[in-house]
């Protein structure tokens, strides 16, 4: 079992990042939040890990904070919520805002995550509401729940940008290379524009 990995950030894709350690590139699935916190290519980064092993799959999932890792594991404990859904939930806002939404029973916020329907949102609230502690959140963090911008879904924006660039005739590798140099907090439209500037040089 892995605790964490410290290595060089080498790239980003639709739902994972690549970390190089001892000349080996590790494919690590992650959330939009963690993707947005990646350094420049070649710089060092530390990710806290969880390994998932199934009959047909072995994967590493990593996050820049222990808090996000623990929330990921908590979401996986819910029947019907897999790794993909958990990452989707962790991509729509900060961990604290997700916790706040669960404690407040805010189904609308939770169903913003791609792949999460009303029934799943209700199950998440029912099973986790009593496990989360209100004193873990400040009032300021709680207030943020009303002002979350759609652009906080980093992984969704990255996917859409990559798809748009590939639709324009660029290869996935070319699109990814350009996107690595673009600010991930921009809107999809602006990420496409900035990526095209790099690709047309």
Curated annotation (Swiss-Prot):
GO cellular component: cytoplasm; Holliday junction helicase complex; Holliday junction resolvase complex
Compartmental location: Cytoplasm
Region (Domain I): 1-64
Gene Ontology biological process terms in this record: DNA recombination; DNA repair
InterPro entries (UniProt xref): DNA_helicase_Holl-junc_RuvA_I (IPR013849), Hlx-hairpin-Hlx_DNA-bd_motif (IPR003583), NA-bd_OB-fold (IPR012340), RuvA (IPR000085), RuvA_2-like (IPR010994), RuvA_C (IPR011114), RuvA_C_sf (IPR036267)
One matching Pfam family: RuvA_N
Stretch list, region Domain II: 65-143
GO terms assigned for molecular function: ATP binding; four-way junction DNA binding; four-way junction helicase activity
Keywords, comma-separated and alphabetical: Cytoplasm, DNA damage, DNA recombination, DNA repair, DNA-binding
Keyword Iron (UniProt): no
Residue segments, region Flexible linker: 144-152
Keyword presence, Cytoplasm: yes
Region described as Domain III: 153-201
Self-association and partners: Homotetramer. Forms an RuvA(8)-RuvB(12)-Holliday junction (HJ) complex. HJ DNA is sandwiched between 2 RuvA tetramers; dsDNA enters through RuvA and exits via RuvB. An RuvB hexamer assembles on each DNA strand where it exits the tetramer. Each RuvB hexamer is contacted by two RuvA subunits (via domain III) on 2 adjacent RuvB subunits; this complex drives branch migration. In the full resolvosome a probable DNA-RuvA(4)-RuvB(12)-RuvC(2) complex forms which resolves the HJ.
Function: The RuvA-RuvB-RuvC complex processes Holliday junction (HJ) DNA during genetic recombination and DNA repair, while the RuvA-RuvB complex plays an important role in the rescue of blocked DNA replication forks via replication fork reversal (RFR). RuvA specifically binds to HJ cruciform DNA, conferring on it an open structure. The RuvB hexamer acts as an ATP-dependent pump, pulling dsDNA into and through the RuvAB complex. HJ branch migration allows RuvC to scan DNA until it finds its consensus sequence, where it cleaves and resolves the cruciform DNA.
Domain description: Has three domains with a flexible linker between the domains II and III and assumes an 'L' shape. Domain III is highly mobile and contacts RuvB.
Protein name from the UniProt record: Holliday junction branch migration complex subunit RuvA
Source organism per UniProt: Clostridium perfringens (strain ATCC 13124 / DSM 756 / JCM 1290 / NCIMB 6125 / NCTC 8237 / Type A)
């Amino acid at each position: 079992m892995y605790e964490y990995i410290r290595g060089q950030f080498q790239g980003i894709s639709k739902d994972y990042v690549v970390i190089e350690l001892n000349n080996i590139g590790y494919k690590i699935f992650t959330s939009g939040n963690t993707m947005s916190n990646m350094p420049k290519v070649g710089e060092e980064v530390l990710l806290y890990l969880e390994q998932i092993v199934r009959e047909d799959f072995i994967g590493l999932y990593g996050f820049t904070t222990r808090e996000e890792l623990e929330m990921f594991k908590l979401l996986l404990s819910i029947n019907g919520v897999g790794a993909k859904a958990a990452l989707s939930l962790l991509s729509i806002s900060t961990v604290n805002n997700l916790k706040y939404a669960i404690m407040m029973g805010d189904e609308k916020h939770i169903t913003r995550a791609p792949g999460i329907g009303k029934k799943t949102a209700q199950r998440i609230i029912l099973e986790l509401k009593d496990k989360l502690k209100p004193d873990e959140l400040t009032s300021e963090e709680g207030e943020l729940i009303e002002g979350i911008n759609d652009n906080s879904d980093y992984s969704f924006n990255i996917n859409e940008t990559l798809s748009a660039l590939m639709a324009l005739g660029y290869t996935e590798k070319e699109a990814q290379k350009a996107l690595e140099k673009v600010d991930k907090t921009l809107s999809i439209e602006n990420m496409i524009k900035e990526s095209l500037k790099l690709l047309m040089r």
